[in-house]
Every structure is written in C-alpha cells, then in structure tokens.
A protein has these predicted regions:
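Sec-type signal peptide cleavage vicinity
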Residues: 2-342
Length: 342
C-alpha cells in the first residue's frame, strides 16, 4: 500500500475589538477634591473566526479580568501641553494593573497634574521583569506550546487631566496557529493512530524554524510592518505527542501556537515543515502493525493578528481491482472439417 498525506491551511482574518467596561478607580487621595487618580480601562481583541466557520479559543473580557497578571503600563510625563509624543517611564514604570470587583486597579495610585500630558504604553499579560527601551520591549516565545502567551499591546498618547480614564485598545501582537486532523480510511479493518506532530525547519526535523525572541515596538499602530525587529534564535515545536485514534471527522486541538510573525512563503529564506508520525493497525486475517512518518512543506506568511489552521488528513491508498478478458484467439487451423455421413 502507498501512504497519502494532505495538508491545507485556512487563514483567518482578525476581527474588530470588543469593549469591556470598568468603573472609575476609587480615589485614595488626600481628601483634596482637586486631585483625580489616573484610572485605566481596556478594550480586548478577540480571536479570529475561520473562513469555514470553525472557531478558536477566544481571549474574552472575562479572561483578562480574571487573570492574575492583568496588564503592564509605562507612562511618561511631559510638563508642557505640547502634543509632542515622548515615550518613557518617568511616571509609570511597568505598573501592574489588575481587575478587582468592578474596576481596573493598581497600587500606589498616581494623580493627574494640572498641566502637561502623559504618553502611555501597555502590554499584556504583565511580566515583572519587563524592561522598556525607548518604546520597545523584548519578548521570548515559550518553547513548550502549553506555556505560550497571547501577547497584546496598546498605546494612548497625549493624555491629560480632562481625560480622567486612560482607555487602551489592545491588539494581538503574534500569529496564532491551530490544527485539525482526520483520516480518509473508511472501514473496520484498519486503524490509524496519531503519535506525534512536529513543526520544524526541515523535513527531517534537524533544522529549526520559528523565531525564539524579538523586540516589539509598543508605540506602533495595529498592522504596522515594522512592529517587530531584532529576531534572535530559532526553535521547533512538538505540537502533539501521545496516542489518538483518528476518524473521518476532523478533530481540532486547543494547544494553539502563538508565534512571532514570520514569512515562510516561497519567496522567503525560512522554511517550515509539518512532520506527522502515526501507526497503522491492520485487523484483517493477516494482522499487522507498522509506524510511518510523513512530512509536507508549508509555504505561508504568518502575519500579526491573524489566526491560521493547518488541516491534516492521514490516509492509505486502497487496494483496488480491475478486470479485463482477452478475446478468443482463432488459430489458422482452427476449423475442423468433418466429412459428411452417407
């Protein structure tokens, strides 16, 4: 029998953002009605919807509000009212903001000054050791799929006392990749068991593919082509490792990859392969078990804020029969004459 392996990618465009409300922070001021605490509100992006109608896990408003990390904020104060944007951390230095009861809170509270403005940068989820260089932070993609984070970023410029609440519109900074898997084998005599799925930079898995780390500019707008720079290192990912009997119905997995945007198209220098290990069990009169590995090259540019699905179909080439019958051969001496009987 010959093995067959098919792969398809469904690209999904990011949707518009959905809002989440919050009340103004309760002021812990010095009883001066002239001082107003700087409070925060956030709008959270949601995952894309596939063109075929399937849906990935959604980063909802509740998810961010219930998270222990919340989001981190950098804020830079300028004493004049000029509209010049100056990013930094002289007012907020990686301040953690979390949701409690009905509001986004932080401690210690800081207050608006009568004059000047503040330029804000934000990211989520918050990480204690995140350092700001100008308007940029470094980000490392976790090597274990289950530990990867859906990085968000936002900015809000030229904010003054009259604004009261600083509202962030967060965008997805990474590309999200999911997969479905099924078999085209129909019948009761053969079982296909999935053992492993790997994404690598070569068909043999020896070359690494995905960026390990990069630098994101929090001051950039959504879809900016120069959002990411300073890529370092490469790594592969083991997407699945276990046993899963396949059927003709596609099964999706919740272990999404969150990766730095990267170009694996034909014109790019980077390569990406999906490698699948599986077991074939024959339950006919002559029972047999064998393992197999197949691979396929993925030529796709994975873009920021977009979700993708790799559709895998694992199967066998069925044994088929055909029949033909040769024509009767008429020999030259095929005629047998019998003398007549008198």
């Amino acid at each position: 029998m010959y093995k067959k392996f098919f792969m398809g990618i469904a690209a999904m465009a990011a949707l518009t953002l959905v809002s989440c409300s919050s009340d103004d922070l309760n002021s812990l001021s010095d009883n001066s009605s002239k001082n107003e605490a700087i409070s925060f509100d956030g709008y959270l992006g949601r995952s894309a919807v596939a063109v075929n109608g399937s849906r990935g896990s959604e980063l909802t408003k509740d998810a961010l509000q219930k998270s222990e990390e919340g989001f981190g904020v950098f804020g830079n104060y300028t004493a004049t009212d000029v509209t010049t944007t100056t990013y930094g951390e002289n007012w907020f230095k990686n301040q953690q903001v979390t949701y409690k009861t009905s509001a986004w809170t932080y401690n210690p509270l800081k207050y608006w000054l009568p004059e000047g403005h503040i330029d804000f940068l934000a990211y989520a989820p918050y990480a204690k050791n995140t350092a700001l260089t100008e308007s940029k932070i470094n980000f490392t993609v976790a090597d274990q799929v289950g530990n990867q984070k859906d990085l968000l970023w936002a900015n809000a410029t030229n904010k003054k006392k009259a604004d009261k609440t600083v509202t962030f519109t967060f965008n997805h900074a990474l590309a999200k990749i999911g997969y479905t898997v099924k078999t085209n084998v129909v019948g009761t005599f053969t079982t296909i068991t999935l053992n492993k799925i790997t994404l690598a930079g070569s068909a043999d898995g020896k070359k690494n593919a995905f960026y390990t780390s990069g630098t994101i500019d929090l001051s950039k707008v959504n879809k900016a082509t120069d959002l990411w720079t300073n890529f370092e290192g490469k790594q592969n990912f083991t997407w699945f490792n276990g046993t899963q009997n396949l059927t003709s119905t596609s099964v999706s997995n919740s272990n999404y990859l969150f990766v730095i945007p990267q170009d694996f198209s034909d014109a790019a220098s980077d390569d990406l392969y999906v490698i699948v290990d599986y077991t074939i069990n024959y339950n006919t009169g002559a029972a047999a078990t064998m393992t197999s590995q197949v691979s396929s090259k993925i030529t796709k540019k994975f873009e920021q804020g977009k979700a993708y699905t790799i559709n895998l179909t694992i199967g066998l080439t069925p044994i088929e029969f055909n029949a033909d019958v040769t024509e009767w051969e008429i020999p030259t001496d095929g005629a047998i004459d019998i003398d007549s009987w008198n």
